[in-house]
């Protein structure tokens, strides 16, 4: 962050992590297990503003300034724009790298080119995908479906089969809730998935 604290969960878009680790690992998976596609989570929706020295160098090249702009400053929107452009560069880089060796591999980045990233598709992805919030899922699906059905790409949405409420564990949704969520997606022509958490042994409760 701006104070120099690092994030233990988020990789910098300006680092060599994709080239050094992620892309080789994805190629290994494709080569070793003959998978037909990859779906990467926590991509555009997990991206953070970067205040590292590599980001500073990129910002200087982008804007000519040595200093990061303050939130609310006139240049702050340009600072965010730089990160958006960098994310798309990163997305195209890993997709193109995989296709260079596995041209038939279907690549998908969760929530890319949806309302979370409302841009024309500029990466060689196979489809558009997202998993919407466990709360108010029907309303979220209604908004997202109207956008996705106009992209010209195959798309799918996944709803959670349970709610998570502060102070209590996961609460399984009713059949009626899940049917409503699925109906909204399917009536707009999208693919539908439902997300449950099986046990480590793969057991799925009978009620599911």
Language-model regions, residue ranges each:
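Short, solvent-exposed beta-strand-terminating loops
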Residues: 41-65
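Polar helix-capping/helix-linker motif
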Residues: 1, 14-15, 52, 203-206
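Short acidic catalytic loops
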Residues: 22, 29-47, 193
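Hydrophobic targeting/anchoring helices
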Residues: 36-41, 69-81, 86-208
């Amino acid at each position: 962050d701006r104070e120099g604290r690092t994030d233990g969960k988020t990789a910098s878009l300006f680092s060599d992590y994709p080239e050094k680790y992620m892309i080789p690992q994805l190629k290994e998976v494709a080569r070793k297990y003959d998978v037909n596609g990859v779906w990467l989570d926590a991509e555009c929706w997990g991206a953070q503003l970067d205040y590292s020295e590599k980001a500073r160098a990129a910002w200087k090249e982008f804007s000519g300034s040595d200093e990061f702009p303050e939130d609310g400053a006139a240049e702050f929107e340009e600072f965010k724009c730089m990160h958006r452009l960098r994310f798309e560069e990163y997305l195209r880089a890993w997709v193109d790298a995989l296709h260079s060796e596995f041209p038939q591999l279907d690549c998908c980045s969760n929530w890319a080119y949806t309302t979370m990233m409302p841009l024309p598709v500029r990466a060689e992805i196979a489809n558009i995908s997202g998993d919407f919030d466990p709360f108010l899922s029907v309303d979220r699906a209604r908004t997202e479906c109207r956008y996705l059905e106009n992209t010209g790409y195959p798309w799918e949405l996944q709803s959670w089969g349970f709610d998570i409420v502060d102070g209590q564990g996961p609460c399984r949704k009713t059949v009626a809730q899940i049917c409503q969520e699925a109906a909204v997606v399917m009536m707009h022509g999208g693919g539908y998935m439902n997300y449950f958490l099986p046990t480590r042994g793969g057991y799925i409760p009978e009620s599911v």
